[in-house]
Amino acid sequence: MVKGVAVLSSSEGVSGTIYFTQEGDGPTTVTGNVSGLKPGPHGFHVHALGDTTNGCLSTGPHFNPAGKEHGAPDDEVRHAGDLGNVTVGEDGTAAFTIVDKQIPLTGPHSIIGRAVVVHADPDDLGKGGHELSKTTGNTGGRVACGINGLQG
């Protein structure tokens, strides 16, 4: 089993820990807890870079090795890093589990060393009709991020 972990931080008081596990060539399971967010859905993505030298802004676009348009996690056409939304409760926290086949922890398209980003607004899953729907899901600013590092 391969495991990764990302510790989220931000200048806006958002924090959290995201765990990744993958057994063999199976799907990757993502479990996380995030706090300090406004209630409601927030876009949640793996970004292409593990660079936080300029905060979350330097993490690059969504991880997209196949060069596809943005979409929902269950869509055939989507960025590999498109993980949809995490839903935050009235207390400002979210606990979630996501199982996904497009974010391996090994091989040429591994997400180890890449950033995980929580956005300010909901991901419209590429279906919102906004000019940014097919690239970012119109998710607004990047409110927290962390680098997915290999875990022992």
UniProtKB/Swiss-Prot annotation:
Protein localization: Cytoplasm
Binding site for Cu cation: H45, H47, H62, H119
Disulfide bridge positions per record: C56-C145
Binding site for Zn(2+): H62, H70, H79, D82
Record keyword Oxidoreductase present: yes
Cofactor: binding details: Binds 1 copper ion per subunit. Binds 1 zinc ion per subunit.
Pfam families per record: Sod_Cu (PF00080)
The EC number(s) this enzyme carries: 1.15.1.1
Function (record text): Destroys radicals which are normally produced within the cells and which are toxic to biological systems.
Protein known as: Superoxide dismutase [Cu-Zn]
Organism: Paulownia kawakamii (Dragon tree)
